[in-house]
Amino acid sequence: MKNKLIIISAIALAALPCAGQTYLNPDAPLEDRVSDALSRMTTHEKVALLHAQSKFTSAGVPRLGIRQLNMDDGPHGVREELEWNTWNAARWTNDSIVAFPSLTCLAATWNRDLSSLYGKAISEEFAFRGKDMILGPGCNIARTPLNGRAFEYMGEDPFLAGEMIVPYISAAQANGVACCLKHFALNDQETDRFSVNVNVSERALNEIYLAPFRRAVEKAHVWSIMGSYNLWKGVHCCHNDELLNKILKRDWHWDGALVSDWGGTTNTMEAALGGLDIEMGTYTDGKVKESQFGYNLYYLADPFERLINDGTISMDVLNDKAARVLRTIFRTTMNPKKVIGSQCSEAHYDACLQIGEEGIVMLKNSRRTLPLRTERYKRVLVVGDNATRSLTKGGGSSELKSLRDITPLEALRKLFGSDKVDYAQGYEAGQAIYDKVDEVDPALQERLKAEAISKAKDADLVIFIGGLNKNHRQDCENGDRESYDLPYGQNELIAHLAKEQ
């Protein structure tokens, strides 16, 4: 009996320290957890929360058992795993995922329930991969169709964007995965995106460009927001005092963490006092080679800590930033209600199909050609490079490594029967390259066009599948379209094909 009493006493004593650690108690009020954690942290530990420790993670506090934040792109699915310190693919064999429809497609459904379904499904994929934060969705306004990243946003209407963004965020965060709403704010072009200074009237600012963000803050209570590269009133938006401290945090009463876009931080004092909470992806201006990964040289790292220690910047500033990051950690990676999630489930594929079908926009059907009656056609010709191209490849941060891709040509051959469907490429689009255009031989373009026109003469039905293809200066990050025309001579090709039908 004596031995049993000793064992019971030992168990009870072991539990005593945890009982006094409010920050580790998931049932305690969030602000109590945050305050308790802050009271136990050193200045250096607080600063460490505020900047990257790898390409897509920010630090926790290992001494206290506070976990790091794992972030990842992107708006339409979980990006393939990258190496810890580089942009190189880690070449995992188990990181293939479901590629969800574009957010423009989601917005075109005008269906809040589908937006909720989207947020639920995509957050389950992120959770299964061990991610705490979706770097998305995006709700910048499509001021011009030339915007290279328009497909990542929800169109040109602020009301529609606001209505559709809320269910996505609410459903994702109900699963314990933070949304990092982007890009705040006024980021509606890729050209000169690091240096353009946006001029906008107060009315347009509030009624158009900020409106969907405000709705996400006030209705969905989004947990994190990503700053944008551009400037407003001459100050970079990732640390713009008026935009972040006065509008977002004071006027809208937002308590989340403001994350910089990768490389969007430019100044320690502005980052400290201008509302930035987590600095990601900064290049260290030659202080070290990028290959050495000088995370301690980030603007909100050692330079910021020195300003705290010498009294130049108040400890209150540091505590506010650290508190915002801790809230995000406790809401996500240290939230026992965060789902385990799933990857490439049939439910997720069904969600993609439902959203994709409802997001289709028919522009014209004057001859009632659609829906196609397969029994009417014996010789079907499919034309277009996009009939065989996977549009999950390329596009910058939205690029995906999808497990299951069905090309339009494959689907049409299944619908009509392989023996009835012929294919002509029609034009060559080249490789999807992030920062340059893959030049195509004009002679090759002429040969491909001639082949398609020749085959069209014998076809009962020609189906053209074209458009943009994730190439630079099309629908791709870091560049905008140069015209409204379809690239690679597609307009001319379509006109020739129409004459043959």
Regions found by a protein language model. Give the residues of each.
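Bacterial Sec-dependent N-terminal signal peptides
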Residues: 1-22
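Glycoside hydrolase catalytic-domain context in secreted enzymes
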Residues: 19-501
